[in-house]
Regions:
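Acidic, Mg2+-coordinating phosphoryl-transfer loop and its flanking beta/alpha structural elements
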Residues: 146, 151-175
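Short, acidic/turn-prone active-site loops that include or flank metal/cofactor-
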Residues: 120-126, 168-173
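Non-catalytic pre-domain segments flanking phosphatase-related domains
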Residues: 1-65
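Conserved Lys-Pro-Asp/Glu-containing loop-to-beta segment of HAD-superfamily phosphomonoesterases
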Residues: 125-151
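Short, structured coil segments at secondary-structure junctions
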Residues: 91, 112-114, 160-162
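Surface-exposed amphipathic alpha-helices with a cationic face
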Residues: 55, 86-91, 133, 158
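Substrate-recognition element of Asp-dependent hydrolases with the DxDx(T/V) motif
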Residues: 62-110, 122
Length: 175
């Protein structure tokens, strides 16, 4: 098996690199068709003022939050600035994590803060978006999906009648 691209000691196979590039291209093409309700540079732009507006305009009461490339870069730890943001968000809205990945340390971080975590979610399939709504005891139209992928997060939220926020990605200084 060919191995290329060594980032922080993680080797990727040629197949993984090709799949990543195809996913990036797919997301780019879909971003021309599927539009989020909100675009932000990073999650911290979703601040108290924006949350207040979302509550008033759309009746938002809960957030489905993605992990990788939304609140942390690659497979690194969640930066402290985003940990603080999550704590403040939790004070204003119901929060649940829905991610296609799974990381025991990240899951433990959220569970320790009484935030439900759904890993291996198979986004954009409807099942776990709806499961998240059930756990928050909210109808889909009262939920905001926050993520970095147009197909997985934005399309997944839209097809479930949810509001969506596209995060450009985690800033380098957030690492």
């Amino acid at each position: 098996m060919w191995k290329i691209g060594c980032e922080k000691g993680v080797m990727k196979s040629l197949e993984d690199v090709i799949v990543d590039k195809i996913c990036d291209l797919t997301n780019y093409m879909l971003s021309k068709i599927i539009k989020p309700d909100i675009c932000v540079e990073n999650v911290r732009e979703i601040n108290s003022k924006m949350i207040h507006t979302l509550k008033e305009q759309y009746g938002i009461e809960g957030v489905i939050l993605d992990v990788d490339e939304t609140i942390r870069k690659d497979l690194n730890k969640i930066p402290s600035c985003n940990k603080k943001w999550i704590e403040s968000l939790k004070g204003e809205l119901k929060v649940i994590i829905v991610t296609n990945g799974s990381d025991k340390d990240v899951e433990d971080f959220f569970r320790a803060r009484d935030i439900d975590y759904i890993g291996f979610a198979h986004k954009p399939l409807k099942k776990n978006f709806m499961k998240a709504c059930e756990k928050m005891n909210l109808p889909p139209d009262k939920v905001l999906v926050v993520g970095d992928r147009v197909f997985d997060d934005i399309y997944g939220g839209k097809r479930n009648n949810m509001r969506t926020a596209l995060v450009k990605s985690v800033d380098e200084d957030e690492r």
